Amino acid sequence: LGETAITLDVVAFITLACALAVYSLYASAVSLRDEAAAHTTLGPSVSGLVANGGLATASFAALGFFLTPWLMRLGGYPAATIALIAITVPMIATFLGLRCWVMTRLQGATGLGEFLAINYGMGVAAVAGLTLGAAAIVFLALVLLAAASLMSIVSSGAISNATCIAIAAVLLVLTGAPAGFRTAGQLTRLHTLLASIGAIGIVLMVVAQLGGWDETAAGLTRAARQLEWATTSGRGGGDYNLALAVAGSFGPGETWNGLTILSVQIAIACTLLLMVWLPWTIATTDVRQIGSQATIGASWGGFLMIAVTIILGMGTLWIDRSGVASAPVVPIPWRNIGDIDAALLMTAVTREYVWAEVVIGLGGAAALHAIALALLGGATAALRPLWLGRLQGKQAARRAVAGSQIAASAIVIGAVSLLFMPVDTLMSLNALALSLSPVAIVPVAAACWFPTLTRQGLIAGMIAGLTVATLEIFLPLISSIAVHAAAAGIATTVIVAVLVSRGRPHDTRQVTRIKANAAFRDIFAPGANDQSQGRYPRAILVALMWIFFASGPGMVIGNDLFGAPNLPRAQWDFPIPSIAVWQFLAWATGAALIWYLARGLGMTSVTRAQLDQINAYRNPPPAARQTGPNISDH
């Protein structure tokens, strides 16, 4: 090992990591046994998900740990604004979840890919599935790279990056390939506990490394030396440092800054919906878990994500690019653009605090393992029609399991192969994947709400949308308004799908979609005394307003509402900048709104009578034999 010294805390981390791996293998074996007994199609373990929001919390913790600061390349509060997808995703999932769950039950679909195949045929299902599968390979490569960097840091270099990648890949194949979401369900409590402890530990240790809460807050005023300045056109004095405010205003041409962040949120939110939330929603057997996951994931998981992102994002500002620390942080050489910014602070923290490797390592490993399992489960669910075909019954169940195992293994192998590319190339592929994958949300929404959009229209629209999104990445066409390529792809898909559907207004599966939508309306038609009928439009309006002010152009109001950041810190209403207060208020109100949607409006609940109606639609009772006129009643 050369000059690397293996200390007690490194040994403890390696030992506990091995224990986590062994337990993961055990959970995977149990999941596979349950899979074979139930003849299901890789659904999550409901018993492991009851009332604790583990899948959502662990997934968001992984984003808060690494992916948001890394992908966005932002320090400070702009990164925390992106982190509010921890609220946006559960909010949208609450609106979509019940209808999507019921529609799949009405039509007998057990996965996202099967749902699209039933409604639009193999063409739409194949385009959407292959797009999501390719994106999953890229995202999983980033997760493996993050895991390798984490393990290398916490082991003080005792384990090389290549070895870490190999270990993580083998563990994913052994745990994720056999049972996917079901394994995630078995591990959800452990993932949640370890990820939460790791997140809290990171926050406390980084703050201590920066000199305590007072020094951290006081150091915000010195952040001007680290990031460039931008204008907000007069709000609170005009020019704010990007570390302390979100650029943009309501002035001509400047609202696009807010729309840029909003469109980035839309891209990430749609990707998480398609690859994590909707596949899990469709696969779960208990519809009530939609509300539980959304509420707990947004409240606790959202809090962790925003807090960790702010601390890590602000902490990286204390280390300038020359490696000279401008606050009480151990000077660390600046790394290449492809490295995780947070790794700078993590290295400093692990050198300074005993047992930091154990806390950070296990928390990060649990969070990354959770989201990797979710990516594998979502991708295989989208790809399943490619190998399932028209099979039914036990034969279909066996092929579904075998095909999912092969597909998951192929995705992991593909992700590892991408790591041999230059980091800049990998980051370009990530930008492309984040732009293309959201296009698949259009056929899902069309099947649930707009059944008149035809198969031909959606195929043409998706091809056009994927083309425009790709061109927007490499040859920007609308860079003047700075909208993310995913938004351009979604808009193109919708426009082309509508135009082609008008020209060819019918397809062979349209009757199936119209009947299912009519059945949903009949089953969930409000009663005469139902007072919630008028609340749904108001709830949608409130949700749109929340998105506008919390994530869209309206967020610039928070720059100076509680004290302009270019004023002395003593004149602030709180010890932290105004935009930070605004973001935590956005988190609190967003979590409360999700709770109201899920509980107050019952958007994630189904009565026994409604379940009976759903089952009756899917499996209609045989027609009663009529009694002939010549048959006696005696």
Would you name each region that the model predicts?
Residues 2-66, 176-179, 198, 533, ...:
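Membrane-interface "cap" regions at the ends of multi-pass membrane proteins
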Residues 3-6, 43-46, 74, 78-82, ...:
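Loop-to-helix junctions at membrane interfaces in multi-pass transport proteins
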Residues 3-8, 69-82, 144-164, 182-192, ...:
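Transmembrane helix-loop boundary segments of multi-pass membrane transporters
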Residues 21, 80-177, 262-270, 279, ...:
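Helix-loop-helix module between adjacent transmembrane segments
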Residues 23-32, 136, 140-144, 148-163, ...:
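Hydrophobic alpha-helical segments and their helix-loop junctions in multi-pass secondary transporters
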Residues 31, 479-569, 588-634:
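Terminal cytosolic tails of multi-pass membrane transporters
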Residues 108-117, 179-192, 273-307, 371-374, ...:
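Hydrophobic, small-residue-rich membrane helices and short re-entrant helix-turn-helix hairpins
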Residues 119-126, 136-137, 166, 380-423, ...:
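Loop-to-transmembrane helix boundary motifs in multi-pass membrane proteins
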